[in-house]
Amino acid sequence: MTLLALVWLLLDATFLITLLWHLLQGCKSGHSLLCSVFQDLIRYGKTKTGLQRPAWLQWFDIPKRCFWHFYCVSLIWNGCLLWILLRLLLQSVPVPEWLQLVLHFLHAGSEPQILDRELSVILALALLWLHSLRRLLECLFVSVFSNGVIHLVQYCFGLGYYFLIGITVLTYCPLDRRTVSTDNLLTQCHWYHILGLALYIWASLHQYRCHCILAGLRKSASGNVINLNHSVPCGDWFERVSCPHYFAELLIYVSIAVVFGLLNTIWWLVVLYVLLNQALAALLCHEFYHEKFDTYPIHRKAFIPFIF
């Protein structure tokens, strides 16, 4: 097993244990220092509302509006990786030595990569880059952030996450192949590339709509911000789940798994991480809505329609 796969497995295990611990009411009502730190680390934004926190924990608070930093870093980093890959494949420009060292360190001991995966890797990196661009623009020009906060650990983790994602994609094809022609890339095109792109577009469209609905709760008809309160969102996938934008995020990562032809094992570990991470965040939001609004629709699930 490579170090990269081990990292994703550890992240999966950590969030699975955290989710199960929360579902079993662990530390939910406890007032010990350990419970306070646990709750502070798993919550952010509105789900921290009403949380009894020691004053010193507030030293680690960072405004939630800094979410745009994650997408800015991802845009630059994954854009650079895509540029390096395209120059290698189309112009025979070698991969920088520092990147080769990073890839070797994280992916040493893996099975030899199979040729003719270049198109899948190019598409995956391009989709990640486009996703980061859209989310950055949404954070800057659509979303209306309250005074909610995130923990410094969550902030640092988020920055590292997008670094790791791009590296994970690159490990799927050999980077010692000097050139690949446009005709060769076209011959690599399969049905799963088209299906993955369709799912990506569909999920991205719904995520954008959901973010617009959330922003609209704090804006007037003319688009001016009129409040920073929390309200019950309605419309689109909100009719089925409390956090459809999290569900759409999961579908976006599944769509990239489809682009890989469902064969990239490490990427499925990434998908599992997104599933567990977003499920925990959705569950906390779902509980917040039910505690704050007595008339909150009881038929809505937290994360996945009809299931969870």
Curated annotation (Swiss-Prot):
It is a multi-pass membrane protein. Residues 24-65, 142-148, 206-255 are lumenal. GO terms for biological process: dolichol biosynthetic process; dolichol metabolic process; dolichol-linked oligosaccharide biosynthetic process; polyprenol catabolic process. Residues 1-2, 87-120, 170-184, 277-308 are cytoplasmic. One of its GO terms (molecular function) is 3-oxo-5-alpha-steroid 4-dehydrogenase (NADP+) activity. It holds the Pfam family Steroid_dh. It is an enzyme of class 1 (oxidoreductase). This is Polyprenal reductase. It comes from Xenopus tropicalis.
